[in-house]
Amino acid sequence: MESEDYLDLKAVATLTIVTLLWGFNYVAIKYSNQGVSPIFASTLRSVIASICGLFYCLKQEEKLFHTDVMLFHGVMVGLLFGAEFACIYLGLLYTDAARSVLFIYLSPFVVAIGAHFFLKGDRLTVPKMVGLVLAFTGIFVVFSGRPKTAKATMFLGDILQITAGVLWGATTLYIKKFMAKRVEPIHTFLYQLFFSIPILLIVSIILEPRWIYKMDPYIIASLLYQSIVIAFITYLVWFKLIHKYSVSRLSAFTFFTPIFGVLFGILLLHEALTVSLMMGLPMVSMGIFLVNWRKRGIAI
């Protein structure tokens, strides 16, 4: 099935809701970190979302796992995905949610550079190069600021979030290279979540001596939100959108996520609002937009 070369109103509305939910997810992770160790929380998220995915496959009468080389690729995607979220959850222990969102969304730049070398027909263009320069300038601006909540360990958290962004980009490239149009969206989703469980659990056992040290309704709600709303519903919706619409046009819309994430971090977590952060945010967002820009623009 060929991809539609435009985003209709339904796609635009869906993308807006998805990016809003993704932005709020960083606040949800901050809440769950108050009572559940971060990597174990990520493991729980993958377990719960995988169970939801298994039931979905059974209901839709889809095969659960492939028996050919696609299974190997599924394992690789799961390992990359697991390493990415280990970095995200650990990084949020040391840095602000607002900064985390910015660094995670370096991923589209990793994809743009990687696609130039590894994917046919997806070359670096002038708008993409301008976007890369603008985005990394924005990252420099953010690093130059020191919010009132700054700690000596914040740099470690920032590095972990940047690593997560690189891993996210690598996962996307791997899927495009080896799995796109060869498996159904539900299988890409299921492989990512299911095969991330072992690596997350192993890392949690090694690094986290205690998994649960506090539990209340807010923490439980946070974990359920991350597992069902984010990991199951929005990821599955995202893969279905990729299956139907132009990927470059879809990707352009993800620059709304850091905006929502920063706003939620400031409004709900009372995180510091700095000049450098507010200067860097639109630069990073515009950079992401330019990386995904086409000569005809974004048709809606």
Question: What is each residue range found by the language model?
Answer:
Residues M1-F40, L79, A83, C87, ...:
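Glycine-/small-residue-enriched transmembrane alpha-helix faces in small-molecule transporters
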Residues L7-A11, Q34-I39, T43, F65-F72, ...:
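Juxtamembrane helix-entry segments on the extracytoplasmic side of multipass membrane proteins
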Residues L21, N25-Y26, L54-I104, F140-V141, ...:
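Specific transmembrane alpha-helical segments of multi-pass solute transporters/efflux pumps
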Residues F40-I51, L80, Y89-P127, L132, ...:
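Specific alpha-helical transmembrane segments that line the substrate/conduction pathway
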Residues L44, S100-L106, Y174-I197, S227-L267:
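Helix-helix packing/entry segments at the starts of transmembrane helices
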Residues G53, V111-A112, T149-E208:
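Transmembrane alpha-helical segments that form core, pore/gating elements
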Residues G53, V75, L106, I113-G114, ...:
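Hydrophobic transmembrane alpha-helices of multi-pass small-molecule transport proteins
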